[in-house]
């Protein structure tokens, strides 16, 4: 069993923002597998998919980005999921829009959602997919990440969401190191 968490902020006003690209990826997986989202007792929305016989628990924390770890750790404990079977999907300002990067470990890189997860799971050694949203050319980062993707960037971000979902489906049956080699 694997736990796949897409990071984002709950609520309609954040739905299509750069900061919610993690939610968009797990939504894509739920859509592909036609599975509903249900509210969990651990302050998140969960959906269960089955890929080649491997159960994957998709989760969208409802804690807001900066407290994502408060949802992830209890779900890991409840389902008895080991850290090597966890994968976190989130936005990355340091990658161009539409680029994805898979890693097995690393720092939070200034991402508050990842800081929270690292704090709660007590390690930096877990799988992740970083989805590029680029940095703003001007203005504050907070306004940028909480803004929607402009029309010109939508084809690139849709492609990145699809590619990320493909990589996650591969992770159901393939060691993450091999998935990294295929998608990086």
From Swiss-Prot:
Primary location class: cytoplasm
Protein name: Peptidyl-tRNA hydrolase
Record family assignment: Belongs to the PTH family.
EC top class, as a word: hydrolase
Site positions per UniProt: Stabilizes the basic form of H active site to accept a proton: 91
GO molecular function term, any single one: tRNA binding
Name of the coding gene: pth
Known EC number: 3.1.1.29
Residues bound to tRNA: 14, 64, 66, 112
Lineage, top ranks: Bacteria, Bacillati, Bacillota, Bacilli, Bacillales
């Amino acid at each position: 069993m694997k736990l796949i968490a897409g990071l984002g902020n709950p609520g309609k006003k954040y739905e299509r923002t750069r900061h919610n690209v993690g939610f968009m990826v797990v939504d894509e997986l739920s859509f592909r597998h036609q599975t509903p989202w249900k509210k969990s007792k651990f302050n998140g929305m969960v959906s269960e998919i089955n890929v080649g016989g491997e159960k994957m628990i998709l989760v969208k924390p409802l804690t807001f980005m900066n407290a994502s770890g408060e949802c992830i750790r209890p779900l890991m404990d409840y389902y008895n999921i080991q850290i090597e079977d966890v994968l976190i999907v989130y936005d990355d300002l340091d990658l161009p829009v539409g680029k994805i990067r898979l890693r097995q470990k690393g720092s939070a890189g200034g991402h508050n959602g990842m800081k929270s997860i690292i704090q709660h799971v007590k390690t930096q050694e877990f799988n992740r997919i970083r989805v590029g949203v680029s940095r703003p050319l001007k203005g504050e980062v907070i306004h940028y990440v909480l803004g929607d993707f402009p029309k010109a960037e939508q084809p690139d971000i849709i492609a990145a969401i699809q590619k990320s979902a493909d990589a996650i489906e591969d992770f159901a049956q393939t060691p993450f190191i091999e998935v990294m080699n295929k998608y990086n």
